[in-house]
């Protein structure tokens, strides 16, 4: 088989199963409205849960820092790219979340890959929830450690896997809020089981940080859990981009030596770090609390209005509200039907989700109004098959 045939066969396989991914060019993709091809849609696909990507205070912080620092960091943080803005943000994050240290990464994918590949050795074992993010599972597969997956949120299965003999160390991997199902992990029980077996716990709280808990401290704080490794990302609740790993002093020093994604990458622009500090200030303020309360009310309104006879609604109380439709083609048709009625929603299909669970992944944000939710429900019930 030639290179070209390999590429063509892979693309053909995606096309015939209605799983070929496509990008859409948009003029505006965050906030209440999405603008594409000159048309405005109610946006139910954005991760900008608190609407902070459009916040004037955060925009101004980025602009002012770009004037001071320029638009790039100029290098790896180990060379010349670790500015006072980066240092300030790390210290603010650590204080906010109650950890000795925080380390910044350019993305959540990079943070998860870096931590797992740096820590795990040949005789170690990773025990991960089956629905963990692709960045976590890919890192686990690429590491020299053994990967075992437990049934989603099944703590008994997790316990059985941890009980089997392991020569090295064990790392339990889960998420705070799951990106495709929108549900939460039983973190307190998972932490108890991990500690009973002397395993460390890594929690990726990409979809919980900023959005839940006191001052937006996230799912772990809400559940009274403090994992050895907490990964938070800034493209959702913070409305910007990037990520951080919260950990102990010694683990931070270790990652600075052995996390290749950190050592060999240009750090985020200082202006981005300063914008993130401004975003954190909003999240922790009374305004941030009001934004979280509004989002929670919108989620409740949506769930109360969905016709369960037409759609399978998962037990999700986060901003992520997936409607399971099963068939790939039906999911695509529903997404297109919603767009025709002015609502932008995304059809999620395998391999992102298991076969037979294609869905509309609807995301609600603080930028929406109650009338937007009512319009979405009206269109959904009219488009049901």
From Swiss-Prot:
GO terms for molecular function: 8-amino-7-oxononanoate synthase activity; pyridoxal phosphate binding. Its cofactor is pyridoxal 5'-phosphate. It catalyses: 6-carboxyhexanoyl-[ACP] + L-alanine + H(+) = (8S)-8-amino-7-oxononanoate + holo-[ACP] + CO2. Pathway: Cofactor biosynthesis; biotin biosynthesis. PROSITE patterns: AA_TRANSFER_CLASS_2 (PS00599). Substrate binds at residues 21, 133, 352. The modification N6-(pyridoxal phosphate)lysine is found at residue 236. InterPro entries: Aminotrans_II_pyridoxalP_BS (IPR001917), Aminotransferase_I/II_large (IPR004839), AON_synthase_class-II (IPR050087), AONS_Archaea/Proteobacteria (IPR004723), AONS_Proteobacteria (IPR022834), PyrdxlP-dep_Trfase (IPR015424), PyrdxlP-dep_Trfase_major (IPR015421), PyrdxlP-dep_Trfase_small (IPR015422). It comes from the Bacteria. GO terms for biological process: biotin biosynthetic process. Its EC number is 2.3.1.47. It is an enzyme of class 2 (transferase). Pyridoxal 5'-phosphate binds at residues 108-109, 179, 207, 233. Keywords: Biotin biosynthesis, Pyridoxal phosphate, Transferase. Belongs to the class-II pyridoxal-phosphate-dependent aminotransferase family. BioF subfamily. Homodimer. Catalyzes the decarboxylative condensation of pimeloyl-[acyl-carrier protein] and L-alanine to produce 8-amino-7-oxononanoate (AON), [acyl-carrier protein], and carbon dioxide. This is 8-amino-7-oxononanoate synthase. It comes from Salmonella typhimurium (strain LT2 / SGSC1412 / ATCC 700720). The lineage of its organism: Bacteria, Pseudomonadati, Pseudomonadota, Gammaproteobacteria, Enterobacterales. The gene is bioF.
């Amino acid at each position: 088989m030639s290179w070209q045939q390999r590429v063509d066969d892979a693309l053909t396989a995606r096309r015939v199963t209605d799983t070929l991914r496509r990008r859409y060019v948009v003029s505006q993709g965050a906030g209440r409205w999405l603008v594409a091809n000159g048309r405005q849609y109610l946006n139910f696909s954005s991760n900008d849960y608190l609407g902070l990507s459009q916040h004037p205070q955060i925009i101004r912080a980025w602009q002012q820092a770009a004037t001071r620092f320029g638009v790039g960091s100029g290098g790896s943080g180990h060379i010349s790219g670790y500015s006072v803005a980066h240092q300030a943000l790390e210290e603010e994050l650590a204080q906010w979340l109650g950890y000795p240290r925080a380390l910044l990464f350019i993305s959540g994918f990079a943070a998860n890959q870096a931590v797992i590949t740096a820590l795990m050795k040949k005789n170690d074992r990773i025990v991960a929830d089956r629905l963990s993010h692709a960045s976590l599972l890919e890192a686990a597969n690429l590491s020299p450690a053994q990967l075992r997956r437990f049934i989603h949120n099944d703590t008994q299965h997790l316990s059985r896997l941890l009980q089997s003999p392991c020569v090295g160390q064990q790392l339990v991997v889960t998420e705070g809020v799951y990106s495709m199902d929108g549900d939460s992990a039983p973190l307190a029980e998972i932490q108890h089981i991990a500690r009973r077996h002397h395993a460390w716990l890594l929690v990726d709280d990409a979809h919980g940080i900023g959005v839940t808990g006191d001052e937006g401290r996230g799912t772990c704080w809400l559940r009274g859990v403090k994992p050895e490794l907490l990964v938070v990302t800034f493209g959702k609740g913070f409305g910007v981009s990037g990520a951080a790993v919260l950990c102990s002093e010694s683990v931070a020093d270790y990652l600075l030596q052995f996390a290749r994604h950190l050592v060999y990458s240009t750090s985020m622009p200082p202006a981005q770090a300063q914008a993130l500090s401004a975003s954190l200030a909003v999240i922790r303020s009374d305004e941030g609390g009001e934004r979280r309360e509004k989002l929670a009310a919108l989620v409740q309104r949506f769930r109360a209005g969905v016709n369960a006879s037409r759609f399978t609604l998962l037990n999700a109380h986060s901003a992520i509200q997936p409607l399971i439709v099963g068939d790939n083609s039906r999911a695509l048709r529903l997404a297109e039907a919603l767009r025709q009625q002015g609502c932008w929603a995304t059809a999620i299909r395998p391999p992102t989700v298991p076969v037979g669970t294609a869905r509309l992944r609807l995301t609600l944000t603080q930028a929406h109004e109650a009338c937007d939710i009512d319009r979405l429900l009206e269109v959904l019930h009219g488009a049901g098959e």
